[in-house]
Amino acid sequence: MSSVDRGNTCRIHLVRHGRTVMNAQVRFRGRRDVALDEVGRAEALEAANALSTHPITAVYSSPLQRARDVGTAIANARGVSEVHDHPGLINVDYGEWEGLTKEECAAHDPELFRAYAEDPDRAHCPGGESLADASNRMIAALLEIGRANAGREVAAVSHGAMVRLAVLRVMGPSIGDWQFKLPTGSATIFEVKDGELSLVSPINRLQPDPHKAAGTTVEDAPRAVAS
């Protein structure tokens, strides 16, 4: 793999999509193509307004409409002509859990759901995909986006579980519970440099001030390296 100098670092604003009715009901959305609700549409505009202060030159999105709508709002605010669908950013395939609450999943198979909650490296959603596979494709997607946009700043819109899995891969066990609070409409900033993904900011709700949006730098975070 060819290396790039620091000037070719790509900064990725990884945005969680806005709220949907299923988010409000705390149900697994998975691959269901549910629309943003009124709150989610407002969050999309908030994200677009906040990121309008950043020199974003490209916008990527999960193919699901709730993410694309946020990506479109960001692209319009930045004058970016196209939102690029990226299959690696799509949500976890929850299989039989899709549409259920956590309580319903736990009641159906307590051991399997305990693994999901406590040991994502081993968890596999029944009839769906493993969290390890979801994590691998998310990291691959972010690295691919970073390589394609060396020296630039971009936005990518994905889903709560996918953002959490990316943070877990970079930070490791130091984050504790991998299902940490991640509000809809929030952003987490990553960078890709020399084929590595690093975490720049903690999780923050988007704000117009770029210094506030960047948050506190995590300079010594472990990194996921492209294979």
Enumerate the language-model features and the residues they cover:
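Active-site catalytic microenvironments for nucleophilic, acid-base chemistry
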Residues: 50, 73-77, 144, 148, ...
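Short, conserved phosphate/pyrophosphate- and ester-handling motifs at nucleotide-, phospho-/glycolipid
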Residues: 17, 159
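GST superfamily/GST-like fold recognition
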Residues: 160-164
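General small-molecule cofactor/ligand-binding pocket signal
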Residues: 13, 84-86, 200
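Short glycine/proline- and acidic residue-enriched helix-loop micro-motifs
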Residues: 112-133, 222, 227
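Loop-to-helix element that buttresses phosphate recognition and phosphoryl-transfer chemistry
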Residues: 13, 19-74, 124-139
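Phosphate-coordination/substrate-recognition cap region in phosphate-metabolizing enzymes
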Residues: 2-9, 46-113, 226
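Acidic, low-complexity terminal tails and accessory targeting/binding regions
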Residues: 1-11, 94-104, 147-152, 168-227
